[in-house]
Amino acid sequence: SDPLTVSNMDELPLAGIIRNVAEKLSVRCMKHNITINVHADDNIKILGDGDQMVQLIMILCDNALKYSPENGTVSIGANKLDDGGVLVTVSDQGKGIPEEDIPFIWERFYKVEKSHCRSVPGTGLGLAIAKEIIRVHGASAEVISKCGSGTTFEIKFPKDKVV
C-alpha cells in the first residue's frame, strides 16, 4: 500500500498557506535576524490535502532557515506558469548543496556532511517526506544550488491540479 495518500482533495489558497507558514516561523526568523519575503499570487488555488501542503511548505522553509546565515533572507513564492501550472519556490542564501549530493537529498536519513557546509540538527527525514507529498499531489521538484550561492527548491504543480 502507498505510504502516503491524499485523503482530502480541497481547493487550497496557496498564498494563504505560504503566509501562514511564514508567520509560524517569524519568531525563529527574528531570533536569527533572517527576513522572510513572500511573493505569492493571491488568486492561485490548487487541489490538494491542506495538512500535507502546510507540511510541505513548512519542511522546505524549515530547511531554508536552517541553512541561512544570520541577517540572511528566505524567499517563498507561488506563481502561475504559462502552461497553466503553478510554481512554488523556496530560496535561501545559505552555503548551497554540493552538486554531487543533490540527487540524494530526497532519500531518508541522507544528510549533506561536507566540510564547507555547516552541520545542522535534523533527522534527515524532512525532504523524504516532502518528496512523497510532492509525488502524491502529482507535482515535480527541482533543486537549483551551487556551493556558496544558496539553494532554490522549485515545486511544479501541473495545470490539472490548479483550480
Set out the residue ranges of the language-model regions:
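Short conserved segment of the HATPase_c
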Residues: 97-111
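Acidic ATP/Mg2+-coordinating residue in the GHKL
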Residues: 92
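Conserved glycine-rich
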Residues: 138-139
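Conserved catalytic submotifs in the C-terminal HATPase_c
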Residues: 10-11, 30-31, 35-44, 81
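Short beta-strand/loop element within the Bergerat-fold HATPase_c
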Residues: 71-84
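A conserved beta-strand-to-alpha-helix junction within the catalytic ATP-binding
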Residues: 8-23, 37
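Conserved micro-motifs of the catalytic ATP-binding
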Residues: 2-8, 45-48
